[in-house]
């Protein structure tokens, strides 16, 4: 397993539509592991394959506090939503930035696991937001296109402690 470079906004791959995964090859299996390593190392809660330069419909998410409950979504599709939440949203492809985005508060997704077994998963709150955000990446959509108002700078906890 290895960390991969995260593509930053302005890289054209982030604006392209990803291709469906037909089978999990050893290359895709390695990509899944690398994406998890990359996401955890960067302190993110989600990562889509285009963010590491691969135009495949693959997303990894982990919103657990311990960072030990990864959700792997191959060819994910949102099949139902409910409610609404509005809050700050950031992205590993836009480091140091955030913006207010309105998303569904509940989302149900159908996808395939790393063994190409179909499943459905539901999420509320942060998990619902992560589902929407990461699946948008697969269609070349960045959260900045959905921001209410302006994107703003964010500081990390480390920077605040040093002041």
Curated annotation (Swiss-Prot):
Reported cofactor(s): Fe(2+)
GO BP, sorted A to Z: co-translational protein modification; translation
Top-tier EC class: hydrolase
Described function: Removes the formyl group from the N-terminal Met of newly synthesized proteins. Requires at least a dipeptide for an efficient rate of reaction. N-terminal L-methionine is a prerequisite for activity but the enzyme has broad specificity at other positions.
UniProt source species: Lachnoclostridium phytofermentans (strain ATCC 700394 / DSM 18823 / ISDg) (Clostridium phytofermentans)
Keyword Iron: yes
Catalytic activity of the protein: N-terminal N-formyl-L-methionyl-[peptide] + H2O = N-terminal L-methionyl-[peptide] + formate
Residues the record lists as binding Fe cation: 91, 133, 137
GO MF annotation: an example: peptide deformylase activity
One protein family per Pfam: Pep_deformylase
Family, per entry: Belongs to the polypeptide deformylase family.
Name by which UniProt lists this protein: Peptide deformylase
InterPro entries for this protein: Peptide_deformylase, Peptide_deformylase_sf
Source species, domain of life: Bacteria
EC number: 3.5.1.88
Keyword Iron among record annotations: yes
Keywords: Hydrolase, Iron, Metal-binding, Protein biosynthesis
CDD domains referenced in this protein's UniProt entry, alphabetically: Pep_deformylase (cd00487)
Cofactor remark from the record: Binds 1 Fe(2+) ion.
Active site: 134
């Amino acid at each position: 397993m290895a960390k991969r470079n995260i593509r930053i906004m302005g890289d054209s791959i982030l604006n392209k539509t990803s291709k469906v995964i037909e089978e999990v090859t050893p290359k895709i299996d390695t990509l899944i592991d690398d994406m998890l390593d990359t996401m955890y190392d960067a302190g993110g809660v989600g990562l889509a394959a285009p963010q590491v330069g691969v135009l495949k419909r693959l997303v990894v998410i982990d919103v657990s506090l311990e960072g030990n409950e990864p959700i792997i979504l191959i060819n994910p599709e949102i099949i139902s939503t409910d409610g609404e939440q509005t809050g700050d949203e950031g992205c590993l492809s836009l480091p140091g930035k955030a913006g207010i985005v309105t998303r569904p508060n509940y989302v149900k997704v159908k996808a395939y696991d790393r063994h190409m077994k179909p499943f459905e998963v539901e999420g509320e709150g942060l998990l619902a937001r992560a589902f929407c955000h990461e699946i948008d990446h697969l269609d070349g959509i960045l959260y900045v296109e959905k921001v209410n108002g302006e994107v703003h700078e964010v500081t990390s906890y480390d920077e605040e402690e040093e002041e």
